[in-house]
From Swiss-Prot:
It is a lipid-anchor; GPI-anchor. PROSITE patterns: GH16_2 (PS51762). The region from residue 93 to 127 is sufficient for the plant cell death-inducing activity. The region from residue 21 to 74 mediates uptake by plant cells. This is Crh-like protein 1. Residues 93-127 are annotated as: Plant cell death-inducing domain.
Amino acid sequence: MRSSTISASAVVLLSGLASAQTFTDCNPTEKTCPSDPAIGGLQVTDFTAGKSSYWEVEDGTTMSYDGTLGAQFVISTATDAPTIKNIGYIMFGRIETWVRASAGTGIVSSFILESDDLDEIDWEWLGANNAEAENNFFGKGNTTTYDRAQYPAVATPIDTFHNYTIDWTAKSTIWYIDGVAVRTLLYDDKQTVGGKNYPQTPMLVKMGSWIGCASKAAETDSATAGTCSWAGGAVDLTQGPFTMYVKNVTIQDYGCATEYTYGDLTGDYTSIKATGGCSADGSAASPSASSSSAASGSSSSTKSSSGSSTLSTVTGTTSAIAVGTATGTATLSAGEKATAAAISGSTTSSSTIAKVTTTSDANSLKKPKHEYGMIDLGVMVLGLGLGYLVM
């Protein structure tokens, strides 16, 4: 994500998105910080079914949900920066989402992975560019250069939903659009400075939209001119509202934990401690996926109409991050079941996300169902027989 020196008020305004490389509540490379709650398995969110308990709404954010278009991130005024964040972290993983970016010069739509020590992996879209998406990364908050971004072509990302995927492992990070790899970043790529700037610490998924250039004056202000140039110029709010849409998000945590802890101040992935075992409601997949499964949604153009219904409206308040009810159960929505089924059984790609059952949980995490074969049953019977003889 493009960053520049910004005022304290702007930091609040951008709700943690634009300032991602320069701010963290507690930096584990500087001091001991609290452990991060882990997703620890597969999490599926279907925003066309309404609000999800697996996402927290940031202060000042009002969200609406549409039965066709999903979550709506709306900018109408200069102080709007709608943002939501997941309740859990991943330690390497695969993240897929169906997004239709917001229009509007100066408007930025963002989908990012961010860690406590300022590692970051991005998908972003500029409202003035209806032909490209942007992918980027940062390590340990290093913003000394802005030469890491790439802009792969994508057909009308502002008018059309597309599948955007990040597959993140200790060896590489791969960005996909509609199942096609558009960038591969190796751990030891020259831009990572021998791996030092390679993102490698527990990540939290955030998404939202924000104003990259608030006014004509900002275009010439030395503190904001760089971001204004990147965002395409000043926003004209009279042309709004400007809306980013997200249909769904699928997160596979490759770690096996209920929480992740930094073992020292290095920020190296080998120092991260995973504790608690896999989630009681999900199991991590192998971190070797090689392509994207365009499982849910459609690549065809989707237009908003006056007939579409808003399911609900939610206003954000501050709350602590929590893993949720790992042992609790709840009924999945029809949309979540369909999404999970598509991911596990009806894709044509070589995604290694494990096949899962669609029995429920409070975090859309699915636990693989164990099946016993004849040999297993035979061993059980033999064991019971021997136990009887001993008695």
